[in-house]
Amino acid sequence: MPNFFRNGCIALVGSVAAMGAAHAEGGIAEAAGKALDSAQSDVTITAPKVMMVVATVVGVGILINMMRKA
């Protein structure tokens, strides 16, 4: 019985959130589009930093390997 109550609460919250998004300005499609745009801008900002860190780690690894062989 507790599972039915939990699942019912989850369904209720999901339906309330969907109704709120549907009645928001522009509807659910525009809200999803804005979320995707926000995620894309985050990726665009962080990708060069991640590549710099990866290149630094690889470079240090190669340097350590060369020092061991010398």
Curated annotation (Swiss-Prot):
Residues 1-24 form the signal peptide. Fimbriae (also called pili) are polar filaments radiating from the surface of the bacterium to a length of 0.5-1.5 micrometers and numbering 100-300 per cell. They enable bacteria to colonize the epithelium of specific host organs. Flexible pili possess hemagglutinating function. It is found in: Fimbrium. A.hydrophila possesses two distinctive pilus types: 'straight' pili appears as brittle, rod-like filaments, whereas 'flexible' pili are supple and curvilinear. One of its GO terms (cellular component) is pilus. Homomer. It comes from Aeromonas hydrophila. Transmembrane segments: none annotated. This is Flexible pilin. Keywords: Fimbrium, Signal.
